Amino acid sequence: YITTEVKNGKLYIKTENNVNLKPSDWKNGIYITVPIKKISGISLSGSGDIVSKTTIKTEKLETVMSGSGDITLNVEASAVSASMSGSGDITLSGNTTDFSATISGSGDIKAFDLVADNVEATVSGSADIKVTANKILNARVSGSGDITYRGNPEKLDTKTAGSGDISKD
């Protein structure tokens, strides 16, 4: 009932059309393990979870989520981007030079434990982003969402529109 397909170097894992999976034991759920040697992107749509069991080491990693699922990753990369629409959570840890976080909806990007030199964070809606920036932080909020940061960035550029807030933790 689960299909896998590789298109243009991308692995797609999904259920067959009109199939709704129900595990025989809800406590244990359904797990799919994907061993990787090289990866540049992770995308989740729907209500599943993606969890890295080890540190993902790559040059550039893009995470995209739409829906109510959760992504939890430990990353070592030169550049990391996280974008979300919906009500899920993206939780990131590790190290990167450049981190970009964009969120619309009511989800959260929790990246206090992803230490970055340069951070660009954009919130629209009621979502929250938590980041650590060492050199540069560009933060934008429109709506009621918040951006909270750690670190002592040398350059801080912030703008808010609405009741949202940008603050140091």
Residue ranges and their predicted role:
Residues 61-63, 83-84, 140-142, 159:
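Short, surface-exposed linear segments at secondary-structure transitions and domain or protein termini
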Residues 90-169:
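Short, surface-exposed interaction patches in beta-rich subdomains
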Residues 70, 81-83, 89:
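Mid-length scaffold segments of soluble, non-membrane domains
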Residues 1-45, 49-64, 74-79, 91-98, ...:
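Acidic (Asp/Glu) and glycine-rich low-complexity loops/linkers
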